[in-house]
């Protein structure tokens, strides 16, 4: 088997809140004196580009996973995990020690996000919905 077919690729993308109008933008992360989310593409043989300066604290990376409704899960999202016997809320964080995306709550700490993948729903994020952080602490 061809080795390039054995490698599973994950889409690398980011989101952040634009400083100019407060909207969420998605694309590539570029850093320097300021932080931008940007995208580029070719049209009619010319390279076109857009970029938005973003609030640094709102930058979050795509986890490569989707919730039960098919929505992309990003760092900083707040998830609801519901089964017949559980109702829990989690914040999505990157653990640099285990090199894994984790669902963090007060009840279950440091559990790999993929353990709950089929039962989770995005209900907001820590930036637009700070009141959801209280649910995580319950």
Residue positions per predicted region:
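Secondary-structure transition motif
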Residues: 1-138
């Amino acid at each position: 088997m061809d080795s390039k077919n054995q490698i599973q690729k994950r889409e690398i993308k980011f989101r952040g809140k634009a400083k100019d109008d407060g909207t969420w933008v998605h694309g590539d992360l570029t850093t320097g004196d300021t932080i931008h989310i940007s995208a580029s593409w070719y049209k009619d043989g010319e390279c076109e580009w857009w970029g938005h300066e973003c609030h640094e604290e709102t930058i979050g990376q795509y986890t490569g996973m989707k919730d039960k409704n098919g929505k992309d899960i990003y760092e900083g999202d707040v998830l609801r995990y519901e089964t017949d016997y559980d109702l829990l809320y989690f914040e999505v964080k990157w653990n640099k020690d285990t090199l894994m995306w984790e669902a963090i709550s007060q009840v279950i700490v440091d559990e790999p996000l993929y353990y709950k993948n089929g039962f989770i729903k995005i209900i907001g994020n820590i930036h637009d919905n700070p009141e959801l952080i209280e649910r995580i602490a319950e």
